[in-house]
């Protein structure tokens, strides 16, 4: 181990075992103790991303973990981000900037280059912070991905760090997951696993204890603790769409989101899931768009392909019918581009080069260009002059007469997005609209909700991060955790 900041890595036996949540919890727990801690994920594959203070993009899970550390997000926290744009390919983002798109086979060969970026970022963080809290990806026991691994044990071996292995007991088979994962590791990898965390346990811990005793005897490794199942924890999902909603009573505004094949940044809708006056529905393939007050076209990593999918499902006609009956329609980022008259991709940035007809609901045309726009912004919504904060992640340049009726006026003087002449259709490039309390309330009133209850989404997220840290204090072996971090136990 180096005398620089200590590194501790959390790996999982499966996807969705609880790695992101545990790293978030450990980050806030250490930050509350006054430890200078920073999150790190060598490689992330996700379509939910955040814009960083240094003008790049990283996975949204790392942005939440940065908040847990009380830090601004930085590209070094997630040096390699893969954003799938086909079933076999992805855009490769290194240190926050898109470098190329490649298929899985080509990326496998590229991993040696990616590892250089990973180690450079880790080195900078380890030099600046006392603890680097690392999140792995998927499982370390994927045999077909072991060669050139940069996301799990390949990274842990390269920087010589200890590993905690987390498993989800709620899905069943937790002992097989843990023991099986260890069996598939090399001797040196197995040695660096210093303990287990069992996640999402329901019931009487005394009934689990015989299994824990067996696990420790079988593996020679300690169980660092058992975290309870928490049903009302609402932090942003790393990739899968979270459809859970807060308990709601009384009249509600109906909001519908069509789920397109390459939907991106669906965390935009988390504030609506949690809003007590909103009934949010995600509608997938094979489903008709139900009646609604507001339809929101989400962001997309492949806008022309998603627009074709929308038409194949008959949703374009359903949207027009929705507008004829007085409904409201909002497009966010790729959704804004779909609302226009034409969409051009001359460079083939999101698939085959070419042009597509848009929905024709706003007098706009968009051309995709190589330089991606990445920025955090503040401004005011055209509705009620409501203040807002958000972020832009897009390659499109949009032009047209509808821009004379902007959806947002930014503090830097730029206008963003557009509104239709009748005011029923609106589009914006800004993600995170609903996270700003005043802007969210204004949009809900625009969509037909008369008496809107203001909800502070940022406060809710901060509350849940604090709850996670409390769970660490109550349920994990904090003495052993501090020792793994090189911190005194006081």
From Swiss-Prot:
Protein's pathway: Cofactor biosynthesis; adenosylcobalamin biosynthesis
GO biological process, one term: cobalamin biosynthetic process
HAMAP family in alphabetical order: CobQ (MF_00028)
Role, per record: Catalyzes amidations at positions B, D, E, and G on adenosylcobyrinic A,C-diamide. NH(2) groups are provided by glutamine, and one molecule of ATP is hydrogenolyzed for each amidation.
Annotated catalytic residues: 333 (nucleophile), 431
Alphabetized PANTHER family for the sequence: COBYRIC ACID SYNTHASE (PTHR21343:SF1), DETHIOBIOTIN SYNTHETASE (PTHR21343)
Official protein name in the record: Cobyric acid synthase
Pfam families the record matches: CbiA, GATase_3
């Amino acid at each position: 181990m180096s005398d620089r900041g200590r590194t501790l890595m959390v790996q999982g036996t499966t996807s969705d075992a609880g790695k992101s949540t545990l790293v978030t919890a450990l980050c806030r727990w250490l930050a509350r103790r006054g430890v200078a801690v920073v999150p790190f994920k060598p490689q992330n594959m996700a379509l939910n991303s955040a814009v960083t203070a240094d003008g790049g993009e990283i996975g949204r899970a790392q942005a939440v973990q940065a908040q847990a550390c009380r830090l601004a997000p930085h590209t070094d926290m997630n040096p390699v981000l893969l954003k799938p744009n086909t079933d076999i390919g992805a855009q490769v983002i290194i240190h926050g900037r898109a470098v190329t798109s490649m298929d899985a086979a080509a990326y496998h060969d590229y991993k040696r280059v990616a590892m250089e970026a990973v180690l450079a970022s880790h080195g900078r963080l380890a030099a600046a912070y006392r603890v680097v809290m690392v999140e792995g990806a998927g499982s370390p026991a994927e045999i077909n991905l072991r060669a050139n691994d940069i996301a799990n044990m390949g990274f842990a071996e390269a920087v010589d760090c200890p590993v905690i292995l987390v498993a989800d007991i709620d899905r069943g088979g937790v002992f097989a997951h843990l023991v099986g994962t260890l069996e598939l590791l090399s001797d040196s990898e197995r040695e660096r696993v210093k303990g287990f965390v069992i996640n999402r346990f329901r019931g009487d811990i005394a009934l689990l204890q015989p299994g824990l005793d067996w696990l420790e005897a079988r593996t020679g490794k300690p169980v660092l603790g058992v975290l309870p199942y928490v049903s009302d924890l609402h932090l942003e999902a790393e990739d899968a769409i979270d459809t859970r909603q807060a308990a709601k009573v009384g009249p509600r505004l109906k909001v519908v989101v069509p789920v397109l094949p390459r939907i991106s940044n669906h965390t935009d809708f988390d504030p609506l899931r949690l809003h007590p006056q909103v009934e949010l529905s995600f509608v997938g393939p094979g489903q008709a768009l139900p009646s609604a007050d507001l339809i929101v076209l989400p962001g997309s990593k492949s806008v022309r392909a998603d627009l074709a999918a929308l038409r194949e499902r008959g949703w374009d006609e359903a949207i027009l019918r929705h507008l004829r009956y007085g409904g409201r329609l909002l497009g966010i980022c790729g959704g804004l581009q779909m609302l226009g008259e034409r969409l051009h991709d001359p460079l083939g940035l999101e698939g085959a080069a070419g042009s597509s007809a848009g929905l024709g609901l706003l007098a706009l045309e968009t051309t995709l260009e190589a330089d991606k726009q990445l920025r955090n912004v503040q401004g005011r919504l055209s509705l009620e002059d409501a203040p807002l904060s958000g972020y832009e992640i897009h390659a499109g340049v949009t032009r047209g007469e509808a821009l004379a009726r902007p959806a947002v006026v930014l503090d830097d003087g730029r206008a963003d997005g557009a509104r239709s002449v009748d005011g029923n259709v609106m589009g914006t490039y800004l993600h995170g609209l609903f996270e700003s309390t005043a802007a969210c309330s204004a949009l809900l009133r625009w969509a037909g909700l008369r008496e809107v209850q203001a909800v502070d989404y940022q406060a809710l997220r901060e509350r849940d991060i604090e709850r996670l840290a409390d769970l660490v204090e109550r349920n994990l072996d904090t003495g052993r955790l501090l020792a793994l971090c090189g911190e005194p136990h006081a």
